[in-house]
From Swiss-Prot:
UniProt function note: Catalyzes the reversible oxidation of (R)-2-hydroxyglutarate to 2-oxoglutarate coupled to reduction of pyruvate to (R)-lactate. Can also use oxaloacetate as electron acceptor instead of pyruvate producing (R)-malate. In addition to its enzymatic role it could play an important role in the yeast cell morphology.
Catalytic activity, EC: 1.1.99.40, 1.1.2.4
More details: Present with 11400 molecules/cell in log phase SD medium.
Residue span(s) of domain FAD-binding PCMH-type: 98-277
Organism: Saccharomyces cerevisiae (strain ATCC 204508 / S288c)
Stored PANTHER family: D-2-HYDROXYGLUTARATE DEHYDROGENASE, MITOCHONDRIAL
Gene: DLD2
Name of the protein described by the UniProt record: D-2-hydroxyglutarate--pyruvate transhydrogenase DLD2
A single MF term (Gene Ontology): actin binding
Subcellular location: Mitochondrion matrix
Primary location recorded for the protein, binned into one broad class: mitochondrion
GO terms of biological process kind: lactate catabolic process
Mitochondrion recorded as keyword: yes
């Protein structure tokens, strides 16, 4: 059994019995969270937020517009709303919190067609929402009103891969898992991994500057992306699909589009540096009694595991209770419940070397009483099962009906204090409790290595009373600790009005100036970002 993998021998000594899995098991690490709540009927965003008005500059689609699109696209590249098809898959976000009213989805199969579409929409002032896998969590990939949806799903080809340098060039619509599988066959690995890897697109993760579970080891996409192909709002194609790791000639323009959420250009191609595939992996699931101990274990892990440390995740007790409610057939990894849990992944090139380092680390933190209990996966199946207790949290948070998700950065010492403050505020407002109370509770989990907290407020319904209790309270708290209101999910529609809590007025003005310069008609992803 898993709980017997760390076996007390004598005194405070512990016997390490973990084995490393085959490298191919990485393919199954992170499954896409595919839960789609049906307990809450999605209302139109325009109804939920009546203070947001449709921009009168934007034209409503006419038969002439449709005829033009038919002249440049095949029948398979055009989806229209009808009595039998309301385009809900494209109009609604994953959480069923935001819903637009688009009547037309275009799925071009070439960059040139993307260019023609944008050139026409810019001239006609037709608003456009770029959409990848639609796995975003801040309402950034769905329309607010009747904007045209431009899906990149048909731009899904691998263009080139250099097995010497590890540089991959691909279309923006390539699914992240497919890109990773492709380079894994050649002993490389994508430098980013997400729970939504089975649905999200490479272009989408670049456009949102997604962080994910490997940032601790491989850094952000600002460092991994070498070049981009972008179609500007006027249809101009900017091709900078470089394969050079060093290029010191002028402004690094690609950085403007990484994290820009499709507001100044649509990414259609990505050149990215992949990393050598590790040969040895291991996952440990540990318990500690306080968040202070979480920090102590992290410091020790960085010191003692060093170059083989690839993920360090923490989960609070409530998050694991929710996960357990969904993993009904799975045995909890530990015998007893604890206030906090840690999931550590190591990956390296030498099994014996990594085995020795991990064994020493675990013995040290357990002898000193920092870690109270723990298990180590012995095979691929157990490894994936341990990861499920982290991966299931987003799905479990929504299982009661809905979830308010906040993705923030905070100094490590303050990381969990936001969860405590949020629970206290919800309790004071008398919103938390058993049904009919609308709030189940607030939970915390996240990436300790980069100070990224995921605060999930599980609810039985979405309502304005809950939202007003949480916002701007959460953002004010983050600002008071000099954090960021968005660590990796982006701004989208949800956080557009709160960027001032993380950026100065001068910075916001520069961003708005860039938007006006590159998209003077404001057609790309309106009502969002800034």
């Amino acid at each position: 059994m898993l709980r017997n993998i760390l076996v007390r021998s004598t005194g405070s000594n512990f016997k390490f019995a973990g084995r490393y899995m085959k490298s191919s098991a990485l393919l199954g690490y992170y499954r896409r969270v595919n839960y789609y709540s049906t307990k809450i009927q999605t209302r139109l965003t325009s109804e939920n937020y009546p203070d947001v008005h449709r921009d009168p500059r934007f034209k409503k689609l006419t038969s002439d517009d449709l005829n033009y699109f038919k002249s440049i696209l095949s029948e398979q590249e055009i989806l229209r709303a009808s009595e039998s098809e309301d385009l809900s898959f494209y109009n609604e976000d994953w959480m069923r919190k935001y819903k637009g009213q688009s009547k037309l989805v275009l799925r071009p199969k070439s960059v040139e067609k993307v260019s023609l579409i944008l050139n026409y929409c810019n001239d006609e002032k037709i608003a456009v929402v770029p959409q990848g896998g639609n796995t975003g969590l801040v309402g950034g990939s769905v329309p607010i009103f009747d904007e045209l949806i431009l899906s990149l799903a048909n731009l899904n080809k691998i263009r080139d891969f250099d097995p010497v340098s590890g540089i991959l060039k691909c279309d923006a619509g390539v699914i992240l898992e497919n890109a990773n599988n492709y380079v894994m066959e050649q002993n490389y690995m994508f430098p980013l991994d997400l729970g939504a890897k089975g649905s999200c697109h490479v272009g989408g993760v670049v456009a949102t500057n997604a962080g994910g579970l490997r940032l601790l080891r491989y850094g952000s996409l600002h460092g991994s992306v070498l070049g981009l192909e972008v179609v500007m709002p006027n249809g101009q194609i900017v091709n900078s699909m470089h394969s050079m790791r060093k290029d010191n000639t002028g402004y690094d323009l690609k950085q403007l589009f990484i994290g820009s959420e499709g507001t100044i250009g649509i990414i259609t191609g990505v050149s990215i540096l992949t990393v050598p595939k590790p040969k040895a992996f291991n996952v440990s699931y540990l318990s500690v009694e306080s968040f202070e101990d979480v920090q102590k274990v992290f410091v020790r892990a960085r010191q003692e595991l060093s170059e083989i440390l690839s993920a360090f995740e923490f989960m609070d007790a409530k998050s694991q209770v929710l996960a357990k409610s969904q993993l009904k057939d799975a045995a909890f990894p530990l015998e007893d419940e604890h206030p906090f849990y840690i999931l550590i992944e190591t990956s390296g090139s030498n099994k014996d070397h990594d085995d020795s380092k991990l064994e020493t680390f675990l013995e040290n933190v357990m002898e000193e009483g920092i870690v109270t209990d723990g298990v180590v996966a012995q095979d691929e199946t157990e490894l994936q099962n341990l990861w499920k207790w982290r991966e299931m949290i987003p799905e479990a948070s929504q299982a009661n009906g809905g979830v308010y998700k906040y993705d923030v950065s905070l100094p490590l010492k303050d990381l969990y204090s936001l969860v405590e403050a949020t629970n206290a505020r919800l309790s004071e407002a008398e919103l938390v409790g058993d049904s009919p109370k609308p709030v189940v509770g607030a939970i915390g989990y996240g990436h300790v290595g980069d100070g990224n907290l995921h605060l999930n407020v599980a609810v039985r319904e979405y309502n304005k009373n809950i939202e007003k209790t949480l916002e701007p309270f959460v953002y004010e708290f983050v600002s008071s600790k000099h954090g960021s209101v968005s660590a990796e999910h982006g701004l989208g529609f949800q956080k557009k009005n709160y960027i001032g809590y993380s950026k100065s007025p001068e910075e916001v003005k520069m961003m708005k100036d860039l938007k006006v310069h590159y998209d003077p008609n404001g057609i790309l992803n309106p009502y969002k970002y800034i």
